[in-house]
Structure formats: structure tokens, C-alpha cells
Amino acid sequence: FDSLSIVREIAYERCILDVGSGGGVPGMILAMVRPDLKVTLLDASSKKTAFLRQALIELNLNLVQVETTRVEQFSSTGFDYIVSRAFSQLNDFVSLTRHLLNKEGRWLAMKGGYPYEELQKLPSWTEVVDVKKLEVPQLNAARHLVIVRLSEEY
């Protein structure tokens, strides 16, 4: 359910990269509810990406790509959004994926509790757009969405 709570933050017909996709959350969920999105699921584990490829066949999600590689070695660029759920600390997330985001793009990081310390450690070339508390039906736990972009000076 928490993956669905970020749908309204994503504009139509955009390119999304889900880093550390694991079982396809949130990327595959976004692709199911928003067929207008071009989604790339990225994970270093060949076991996980094999599962994702099979799931995509079963779900008939044709606009979704799966890549088996480490994010540092991934060379595709120009993503409008880079999303993660439990991938890493914010600083590492934006630093490792900086080369993949387009100039007007956004990072969307799904977090549990409010990430005070992580926000303080973000690089100077980033700017926090918003931190939204996510309301997730049937879940009595803290969830937050951190939205970050490249700073205007960059």
C-alpha cells in the first residue's frame, strides 16, 4: 500500500528508475497502476531480477525494463524520477544515482520515520523539495516520502 501513496507525486508519461528494486517495490506497483510510465527496475541480484522478469511476463507489463547491475555501473541517463524504498541512506541514494537523473528530475525516497539525520547529510548540490507524511491504509507505522532535486545553483 505504501507504494501507491507516492503515485500522485509523479507526472504523466515519465521515465522512472527504481533503484534496488528487490521484489519490484515500488517500481512494479507504479507500472501496474500507471501504464503511462516507462519504468526501469534495477537490482544487482540476478535472482531478484529473474523473479522480476518472470513477474513482468505474467503481468503483461511491456513498458517495464529490468536491469541486473550495480547502480554505479548503470549508464542509462535522463530519468525524470529515481525512486527507492529501503535502498540506502539519502546521501548515498542521491550520490550513487546523480548521473542518472535529468536536470529537472526528482529523487523520491520512501522512508519510515522522519529522517532528520539523513536530511542533514544531503550533499550541497541537492535541495529538499518536501518531506511528506504518507498515510497508508491498514498500516499503523510512520512512513515518509522525501522529495529531493538538484539545487538551482548546480
Predicted feature residues:
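Short, conserved active-site loop motifs that form the nucleotide-linked donor/cofactor pocket
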Residues: V64, G105, V129
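Conserved beta-strand signature within the Rossmann-like core of class I S-adenosyl-L-methionine
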Residues: E104-P115
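Conserved hydrophobic residues forming the short capping helix/wall of the S-adenosyl-L-methionine
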Residues: L56, L101, P123
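A short glycine-rich, Lys/Arg-flanked "PGG" loop and its adjoining helix->strand segment in the class I
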Residues: V94-R106
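Residue-level signal for inorganic ion chemistry
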Residues: L30, K111, V148
